[in-house]
Amino acid sequence: MGILDKVSSPADLKGLDADQLEQLAAEIREFLIQKVSATGGHLGPNLGVVELTIAMHRVFDSPSDPLIFDTGHQSYVHKILTGRRDLFDTLRQKDGLSGYPDRAESPHDWTESSHASASLSYADGLAKAFELTGQVHRHVVALVGDGALTGGMTWEALNNIAAAKNRSLVVVVNDNGRSYSPTIGGLAENLAALRLQPMYDRVMDTGKNALGRMGWVGDRAFQVIHGLKEGVKHTVIPHEMFPELGLKYIGPVDGHDLKQVENALRYAKDYGGPVIVHTVTQKGKGFDPAEQDEADQMHSTGVIDPITGESMAKKTEGAISWTKVFSNHLIDIANDREDIVAITAAMAGPTGLADFAKVHPSRTYDVGIAEQHAVTSAAGLALGGLHPVVAVYSTFLNRAFDQLLMDVALLKLGVTLVLDRAGITGSDGASHNGMWDLSITGIVPGIHVAAPRDARTLELALDRAVAVDDAPTVVRFPKGDAPAGIPAVREEDDYDVLFEQSGDKSEGRVLIVSFGALSKQALGAAQALCDANFSATVVDPHWVVPTADSLLEFARGFDLIVTIEDNGVHGGAGSRLHYDLSQAGIDVPVRNLGVPQEFLAHGSRGEVLEDLGLDAETVARTVVGYAEKL
């Protein structure tokens, strides 16, 4: 029996000696490699925080002392140590273990969101609450890093944390130089410089001792050298970052040396005020394929071989992902248009811009985990005569809504937002679903929003989007492979007709308006209507927003209109169409199918859609049921 088999709670860590702790760390890494290889998940980040997490649980008393994990994907080791080891075979699967902290799973989990840079604000609020309620014996610890320090919210929180000199709060910086890919920007350079600081300090300590033996001459010499040293130091470390914020700074500490980390954390715990513990770690540590993966050190994987790290996913011959279709076509557009530039928020690989950057490196900008800055920076590029394309996950656009509204739309600027992972993403859970973008973008004045149904219409949508130079445009698509071509039986100026057929008895004319990726469900429902003797037509609008006048007029002659979307049904595309029909005086009953107004549990995309009644069979049955009530 290994050490890990004996650990079911943080209390089991307290009595382990140094050798046992080292063995435990090795066993946890092997456990992670075996389990995450079989299920997929965030392997690289968790291999890098094994010792950090063990030390945090040994020094602090969770759950009495909240441990907050920024971005959440660094929490696997925390889950292992808090009694959830036996659930890892179900990681990110329906009704299984969440890939992020989950308050329903354990009292040790204080937060749930997978969005970066929020942990310090949570921690600040918790520390204030403990102070106000007389629970000053409780400590709050936030593990931040893996790129989250590039987010502005982190620095807003640090500014507030530093103002309370006697409030106990420990910020552990996991400095692995990465988010998905290598962390960029001045902050990353400063953290790298801070790693050098002990070298300067050791050299100066040695010099001071040697010169001190020379009496007053030596003292004067040291003062001169010290002045030179400070000048050099401040060149390498321009603002000393954390100390100049008024925060006690400890480090850098080897994040894989348990003794060093524990000593630093114990000092921070007893300090009596806010403390930064700067640790240096290696993402993917202990798994050679991850360590050698220059792109992202296996930040997130599917099912892989636990020895070689090679993907074990079955590939459909000829299949191409939505992301790849976008990437390839944006390169083609940029080859013809020198004004096209691309922006990513620390996710060049996942959003398809890594390939674009290889072809057009000078026209690609990675701003770090800073979606708000990305959108307003894009506005500046547009003001300068360029057409920026900002590629982000749909869920992360939520953070930049004000910038889209006030910095882009108000100025009538031509900026294109490409929203990957729109709709239901599945295994990453509630905070990764892109089920709000049609609702929030749809209220922006002047905006154009497209939801293509397949690879060809994605290319056409992107062409239309970058042709607009006086308003923001949005192109959204889901996770996964783009379906094989879904042809139109007739193409109109503003919409495509995908299906047009009368039932034998034509008991009623039903129009199905399909917004984007659920077109196959719409077509299945149309065939079911015909089988039930109804007349059915399916249309796919070129623009979800604004609603084309020609589509409204086309809809006038039907007995029932049904809309289908993978967005929140409240305030979504269907409800917008319903409103526009009403305003046009078109009095046709409308039924909207979409995602309910609730946070969704994780599972595969197909499983979640089925639970929501948005699978092909249920959609067909529901639509026929609507028609039968005419």
Curated annotation (Swiss-Prot):
Alphabetical keyword list: Isoprene biosynthesis, Magnesium, Metal-binding, Thiamine biosynthesis, Thiamine pyrophosphate, Transferase
Enzyme Commission (EC) number: 2.2.1.7
Catalytic activity: D-glyceraldehyde 3-phosphate + pyruvate + H(+) = 1-deoxy-D-xylulose 5-phosphate + CO2
Cofactor note: Binds 1 Mg(2+) ion per subunit.
Top-level EC class: transferase
Family note: Belongs to the transketolase family. DXPS subfamily.
Record protein name field: 1-deoxy-D-xylulose-5-phosphate synthase
Organism whose genome encodes this protein: Corynebacterium jeikeium (strain K411)
Lineage per the UniProt record: Bacteria, Bacillati, Actinomycetota, Actinomycetes, Mycobacteriales
Gene it is expressed from: dxs
